[in-house]
Amino acid sequence: MSTVPLGRRAVLLGAPVAGLAVACQSGSADSRDRALTRDEERSLATLRTVDASLPLFAMTHYGTYDPLQPIAMASSPQRFACSLFLAGGGPRGPLFGRNFDWRPSPALLLTTRPSREATSLSLVDISYLGIDQDAGKRLMDDPELRRRLLKAAAIPFDGVNQHGLAIGMAAVDTAQPPKVPGARVVGSGRIQRLVLDQARNVDEAVAVFRRYTVRFEPGEVPLHYLLADARGKSAAIEFVGGEMRVLPGAGDWHDMVNFVLSTADESEKRSDTRYRTIAERLRRTNGRLDPAGAMDLLSKVAQHHTRWSAVYELRHGEMTLALARDYRRIHRFKLDA
């Protein structure tokens, strides 16, 4: 990682948190007292502070984890927004850009190295693990709080894996997923972990979605998803009337914000300032942006509550990251598979 100068309504598990994750706040006596495995100890030993101002932490999770473990969440009436895009051309190959817009809370840059699935790099809002701003200040010195990070692998907000497959989500007004006969039911955020673990490209990611029944719990905010891969292929995944709809990208680019693409007409798309701004830039450049240009585009559609702006280089496993709209300080990370 290096830092160099450069001149909600979003949620992960379905709904923004009004409070903390109750299950992670209290925990059971067994989970608190259970001895850590060797992989868990090794994982927590990698924890470090990247940027104390947000704060942003980083950790590598080694070994196995349960992507379907339950994490209790509380809903919120607040409405926030996100912006995502694929820029398929340019000197560094396909780029996946993403603004995550939500209230201030600590974040974790998580590298997962499971024993059998793909290695991945993702960002996690750890308030969903019961670590709010105050708890974040104590995290490095509090063993119980650090232990909660072992659940973070289950809830990526956006990320890329070693094959160059990226995924991110944004909230919409409505989503009615199909009930797949005989399929395992998964949460609206956990499906992203399954995609990062199991898919190498967009086609395989779509197949992962089809293997599970995605469920939005009562009170949760519905979502749609953007997929992109190292070949420059992309697709949006939406749920309309009990049907999963797959919307391929328009040539070398794709654009997604907070309305249902598959039911929106052209006037609705153009009336959304963020969508229009991204689409006009990508159309004008034929999707050819370098990482600095992609970050500049994210800055143009950032809002006052933008938590992070991330640009993933899908052929190189690299990420550039700006926190809280500070585009003069850019953090750089690389996923070494």
Regions found by a protein language model. Name each.
Residues 19-20, 209:
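Generic helix-packing signal
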Residues 167, 174-298, 303-306:
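A surface/extracellular/periplasmic glyco- and lipid-processing/surface-interacting theme
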Residues 13, 22-193, 197-198, 214-215, ...:
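N-terminal mature-domain region immediately after signal-peptide cleavage
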Residues 1-2, 195:
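Short, flexible active-site loop motifs that bind/organize anionic cofactors or intermediates
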